Amino acid sequence: MSTPGLENLRAHYQRFAEDPSTLGLVPRSAAPYRLFAAAGLLALLVTWFAAFHVGLFERADQSVFLGFDDLSRQPHVSSLASFVARLCNPQPFVYLAVIPVSVALLRGRPRLAIAIAAVLLGANVTTQLLKPLLAHPRAAWVLGGRAPVAAASWPSGHATAAMSLALTSVLAAPGRLRPVVAALGAAFAVAVSYSFLALGWHYPSDVFGGFLVAATWTVAVVATLLGAEERRVRSAPHPRSVTPAARVSLRDALAPPGAAVLGAVALACAVAVARPHEVFLYARAHEAFVVGATAIGAMALALATGLMLALRR
């Protein structure tokens, strides 16, 4: 025997499970996301080729690596970097991965939760398969006798894990919170990447590769999800109308990423003011490091912000 309370609960769940609007990603076309996925694959191929077969980029890779390696010799840097980098070790990663999946489920979006799990699993398995497949000893012209990174290091598993967590958190978050989540997720991915670079685990190109694997998987899964939604809505005998949620203004969407940039600049200025002589000498001696570190930060913020803007309602 059913009760009114149970019937209401069943109807409530059925509405969440069937209404495409509950995914927070529709009504949208899957076509742009398919193009983004193709562009991600192309960028991944170009990054790999440059890292292994273009002398200019190989030299730059090593120079940035040296800058991070020398940074680890500063007081307390190594211990802090070790703590942050290990947040994306397998066991902590599994615990962190539960968060975006749980958020999607709590918001009544089971298909989105499955998509998020697919990104988190697929991206990281892909990286672990690519590393031995593409393993090749790196050139060490600039390293000055220091041991190069292991041959099976591209793409970085830690960078893939960090960026996949950042991007799936953007997917899971409510629309009005996505700008803040994107900024925080990018900051997390950058912090993890800087940390394992300082520990000498990877070259910077490994970070770019890991970021691109995570981003490509994210947009590919979103494209698949939206394609399935399009087919389901078209085949429904009585398609229900969807009232779009209030759209976040472009100004509000860009405010948190902008604040993240200003915060990074303010932090750099604070360090420079505290130790001006040391910072100036270090920057002069490691110009490639400054450029490379900036590029990693810019790429992380661009990927998280780009996804947030693409999903903006």
Where is each model-derived feature located?
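Alpha-helical transmembrane segments of multipass membrane proteins
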Residues: 123, 127, 192, 214-218, ...
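Interfacial segments of alpha-helical transmembrane regions
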Residues: 32-38, 102-123
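N-terminal transmembrane-helix/juxtamembrane module of multi-pass inner/ER membrane proteins
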Residues: 1-96, 131-147, 284-296, 305-313
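Hydrophobic alpha-helical transmembrane segments of integral membrane proteins
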Residues: 111-143
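Structural signal for the C-terminal ends of transmembrane alpha-helices
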Residues: 102-110, 169-176, 222-228, 306-312
